[in-house]
From Swiss-Prot:
GO MF annotation terms: FMN binding
Protein name: Protein NrdI
One Pfam family of this chain: Flavodoxin_NdrI
Gene Ontology biological process terms from the UniProt entry: protein modification process
PANTHER family per UniProt: PROTEIN NRDI (PTHR37297:SF1)
Record's function text: Probably involved in ribonucleotide reductase function.
Family label: Belongs to the NrdI family.
Gene encoding the protein: nrdI
Protein backbone atom coordinates (compact mmCIF):
# COMPACT_ATOMS: atom_id res chain seq x y z
CA UNK A 1 0.00 0.00 0.00
CA UNK A 2 1.17 3.51 -0.79
CA UNK A 3 2.22 5.51 2.24
CA UNK A 4 2.67 9.24 1.94
CA UNK A 5 4.19 11.63 4.42
CA UNK A 6 3.81 15.30 3.61
CA UNK A 7 4.44 18.76 4.93
CA UNK A 8 2.18 21.69 4.20
CA UNK A 9 2.56 25.23 5.47
CA UNK A 10 -0.35 27.39 6.58
CA UNK A 11 -1.09 28.11 2.89
CA UNK A 12 -2.39 24.51 2.73
CA UNK A 13 -1.42 24.14 -0.96
CA UNK A 14 0.39 20.84 -0.46
CA UNK A 15 -2.34 19.62 1.89
CA UNK A 16 -5.02 20.24 -0.75
CA UNK A 17 -2.94 18.39 -3.36
CA UNK A 18 -2.50 15.38 -1.07
CA UNK A 19 -6.22 15.34 -0.24
CA UNK A 20 -7.04 15.19 -3.94
CA UNK A 21 -4.80 12.13 -4.32
CA UNK A 22 -7.18 10.20 -2.07
CA UNK A 23 -4.34 8.04 -0.70
CA UNK A 24 -3.35 7.29 2.90
CA UNK A 25 -1.16 10.16 4.09
CA UNK A 26 0.36 11.47 7.30
CA UNK A 27 1.13 15.15 7.79
CA UNK A 28 4.34 16.37 9.42
CA UNK A 29 3.22 18.84 12.11
CA UNK A 30 4.01 22.50 11.50
CA UNK A 31 5.06 22.89 15.14
CA UNK A 32 7.24 19.91 16.07
CA UNK A 33 10.21 21.77 17.54
CA UNK A 34 11.74 18.75 19.24
CA UNK A 35 11.48 16.56 16.13
CA UNK A 36 9.57 13.83 17.94
CA UNK A 37 7.16 13.13 15.06
CA UNK A 38 7.82 9.59 13.85
CA UNK A 39 6.59 7.24 11.13
CA UNK A 40 6.87 3.46 11.12
CA UNK A 41 6.49 2.38 7.50
CA UNK A 42 8.19 3.19 4.19
CA UNK A 43 6.89 6.38 2.59
CA UNK A 44 7.15 8.85 -0.25
CA UNK A 45 7.68 12.41 1.00
CA UNK A 46 5.71 15.30 -0.53
CA UNK A 47 6.85 18.81 0.39
CA UNK A 48 6.74 22.41 -0.78
CA UNK A 49 9.83 24.38 -1.74
CA UNK A 50 10.59 27.53 0.18
CA UNK A 51 12.49 30.51 -1.23
CA UNK A 52 16.01 29.60 -0.15
CA UNK A 53 19.01 31.89 -0.39
CA UNK A 54 19.80 34.86 1.85
CA UNK A 55 17.35 37.53 2.99
CA UNK A 56 17.98 41.27 2.69
CA UNK A 57 19.08 41.26 6.34
CA UNK A 58 21.60 38.48 5.63
CA UNK A 59 19.60 35.70 7.29
CA UNK A 60 20.14 32.33 5.62
CA UNK A 61 16.96 30.56 4.54
CA UNK A 62 16.35 27.04 3.36
CA UNK A 63 14.55 25.56 0.38
CA UNK A 64 13.49 22.69 2.66
CA UNK A 65 10.99 23.61 5.40
CA UNK A 66 12.50 23.38 8.91
CA UNK A 67 9.92 20.81 10.16
CA UNK A 68 10.94 18.52 7.28
CA UNK A 69 14.61 18.93 8.17
CA UNK A 70 13.89 18.00 11.80
CA UNK A 71 11.76 15.03 10.65
CA UNK A 72 14.51 13.69 8.38
CA UNK A 73 17.27 14.31 10.91
CA UNK A 74 15.68 11.49 12.91
CA UNK A 75 17.60 8.41 11.63
CA UNK A 76 14.51 6.21 11.99
CA UNK A 77 12.35 8.48 9.81
CA UNK A 78 15.18 8.95 7.32
CA UNK A 79 15.63 5.18 6.95
CA UNK A 80 12.05 4.80 5.72
CA UNK A 81 12.00 7.41 2.94
CA UNK A 82 11.75 5.82 -0.51
CA UNK A 83 11.22 8.82 -2.83
CA UNK A 84 10.30 12.49 -2.92
CA UNK A 85 7.74 14.67 -4.72
CA UNK A 86 8.00 18.46 -4.54
CA UNK A 87 5.71 21.44 -5.00
CA UNK A 88 6.93 24.86 -5.99
CA UNK A 89 6.25 28.08 -7.83
CA UNK A 90 7.58 28.59 -11.36
CA UNK A 91 8.08 32.29 -10.52
CA UNK A 92 11.26 31.16 -8.74
CA UNK A 93 12.85 29.99 -12.01
CA UNK A 94 15.67 27.49 -11.49
CA UNK A 95 14.68 27.12 -7.83
CA UNK A 96 11.31 25.61 -8.86
CA UNK A 97 10.75 22.56 -6.62
CA UNK A 98 14.39 22.68 -5.53
CA UNK A 99 13.56 21.11 -2.14
CA UNK A 100 12.97 17.87 -4.06
CA UNK A 101 16.49 18.00 -5.51
CA UNK A 102 17.98 18.53 -2.06
CA UNK A 103 16.05 15.67 -0.43
CA UNK A 104 16.75 13.35 -3.36
CA UNK A 105 20.50 14.01 -3.21
CA UNK A 106 20.88 13.93 0.55
CA UNK A 107 18.69 10.88 1.15
CA UNK A 108 19.72 9.03 -2.04
CA UNK A 109 16.15 8.49 -3.21
CA UNK A 110 14.46 9.20 -6.56
CA UNK A 111 12.79 12.54 -7.23
CA UNK A 112 9.52 11.29 -8.73
CA UNK A 113 7.57 14.41 -9.67
CA UNK A 114 7.27 18.18 -9.34
CA UNK A 115 4.12 20.29 -9.50
CA UNK A 116 3.20 23.94 -9.19
CA UNK A 117 1.38 25.27 -6.10
CA UNK A 118 -1.70 23.01 -5.60
CA UNK A 119 -1.14 21.03 -8.79
CA UNK A 120 -3.59 20.44 -11.61
CA UNK A 121 -6.04 17.57 -12.10
CA UNK A 122 -3.47 16.11 -14.52
CA UNK A 123 -0.76 16.32 -11.82
CA UNK A 124 -3.03 14.47 -9.38
CA UNK A 125 -3.72 11.70 -11.90
CA UNK A 126 -0.06 11.37 -12.89
CA UNK A 127 1.15 11.24 -9.29
CA UNK A 128 -1.51 8.72 -8.25
CA UNK A 129 -0.65 6.47 -11.21
CA UNK A 130 3.10 6.98 -10.79
CA UNK A 131 2.99 6.12 -7.09
CA UNK A 132 1.23 2.85 -7.87
CA UNK A 133 3.92 1.96 -10.40
CA UNK A 134 6.69 3.04 -8.03
CA UNK A 135 5.48 0.91 -5.10
CA UNK A 136 4.96 -2.09 -7.41
CA UNK A 137 8.50 -1.66 -8.74
CA UNK A 138 9.92 -1.51 -5.21
CA UNK A 139 8.04 -4.67 -4.24
CA UNK A 140 9.46 -6.47 -7.28
CA UNK A 141 13.01 -5.33 -6.41
CA UNK A 142 12.55 -6.44 -2.82
CA UNK A 143 11.31 -9.88 -3.90
CA UNK A 144 14.39 -10.31 -6.11
CA UNK A 145 16.85 -9.07 -3.49
CA UNK A 146 17.76 -5.95 -5.48
CA UNK A 147 16.38 -3.35 -3.08
CA UNK A 148 18.79 -1.15 -1.13
CA UNK A 149 18.00 0.98 1.88
CA UNK A 150 18.49 4.74 1.51
CA UNK A 151 21.34 6.50 3.26
CA UNK A 152 21.13 6.97 7.01
CA UNK A 153 23.73 9.74 6.90
CA UNK A 154 22.65 12.70 8.96
CA UNK A 155 23.34 16.24 7.87
CA UNK A 156 23.75 19.18 10.21
CA UNK A 157 22.40 21.79 7.80
CA UNK A 158 19.52 20.42 5.78
CA UNK A 159 17.86 17.06 5.58
Amino acid sequence: MTSLVYFSSVSENTHRFVQRLGLPATRIPIHDRDGSFRVDEPYVLILPTYGGGVTVTGRDTSYVPKPVIRFLNNPHNRSLIRAVIAAGNTNFGESFCYAGNIISQKCHVPFLYRFELMGTAEDVDRVREGLGEFWNHLETEKEHGQWRQPSLTRSRQEA
